[in-house]
């Protein structure tokens, strides 16, 4: 069977509700605007339908990102084997204590959302916790690297919102990753649209445990139109 290494099952109701190629910032903004249009029943039906569609497509294992408990009932009775990554994010969030109830579900572990949306202390705490793989959004847009250079759309967005970042001194997302995550921790790096050879060298030179590059081509084309430089991998 096939493996879907990166899924947001609980967001299945948003399929087709957000314009294509609006870029990462546009996608995030549109998501916050449209999500309240859907009832709890519509959301639940979309989760059921997505699970069934994946099984029909030959998918037998899924790495699913979760921010809440709305999809666990479907996953518990599905024929698909799910591994759930409970996602921590928020520049004003100091700990993951509010997510701990979700970790009671089977095959569920904590992961940071990305290297640009989590402050240093919680990132290091999550990276040091347990031995399950981490699933991290990585270099999805040019703005991620630009943020560490105090420029670009993420930098402007954060400045306008009054967010401060205590991690920009690392110099780049890749350098932050290897400084904060132990070398023997397995990682799934998701999207990878804007990785460079230097990023790859930094990452692969650090980790002794497996690193999986999860490319999400359909998602990348839909959100930004960007394609990972697969020739480097």
Language-model features: locations:
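Active-site gating/metal-coordination segments in enzymes
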Residues: 48, 52, 60, 99-133
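Alpha-helical scaffold segments that flank or form the walls of functional sites
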Residues: 13-77, 99-105
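Histidine-centered catalytic micro-motifs
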Residues: 1-12, 133-142
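Structural preference for beta-strand elements that scaffold enzyme active sites
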Residues: 3, 28-29, 60-61, 81-83, ...
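Short, charged, surface-exposed secondary-structure boundary motifs
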Residues: 91-99, 145, 221-228
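Active-site-adjacent C-terminal substructures of enzyme catalytic domains
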Residues: 113-124, 163-233
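Active-site gating loops and adjacent loop-to-helix segments of metal-dependent hydrolytic enzymes
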Residues: 11-45, 83-86, 141-185, 206-207
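A cross-domain feature marking catalytic cores of carbohydrate-active enzymes
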Residues: 7, 65-66, 84-88, 111-114, ...
């Amino acid at each position: 069977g096939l493996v879907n290494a990166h899924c947001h099952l609980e967001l299945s109701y948003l399929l087709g509700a957000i314009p294509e190629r609006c870029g990462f910032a546009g996608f995030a903004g549109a998501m916050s605007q449209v999500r309240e249009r859907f009832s709890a029943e519509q959301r639940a039906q979309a989760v059921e339908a997505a699970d069934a569609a994946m099984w029909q497509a030959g998918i037998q294992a899924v790495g699913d990102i979760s921010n809440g408990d709305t999809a666990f009932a479907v996953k518990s009775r599905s024929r698909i084997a799910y591994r759930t990554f409970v996602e921590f994010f928020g520049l004003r969030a100091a700990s993951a204590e509010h997510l701990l109830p979700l970790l009671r579900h089977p095959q569920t572990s904590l992961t940071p959302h990305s290297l640009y949306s989590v402050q240093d202390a919680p990132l290091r705490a999550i990276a040091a916790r347990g031995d399950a793989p981490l699933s991290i959004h990585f270099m999805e847009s040019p703005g991620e690297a630009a943020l560490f250079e105090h420029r670009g759309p993420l930098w402007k967005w954060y400045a306008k919102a009054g967010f401060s970042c205590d991690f920009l001194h690392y110099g780049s997302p890749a350098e932050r990753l290897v400084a904060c995550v132990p070398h023997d921790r397995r990682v799934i790096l998701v999207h990878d649209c804007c990785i460079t050879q230097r990023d790859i060298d930094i990452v692969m030179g650090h980790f002794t445990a497996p690193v999986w590059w999860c490319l999400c081509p359909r998602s990348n084309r839909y959100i930004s139109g960007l394609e990972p430089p697969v020739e480097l991998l």
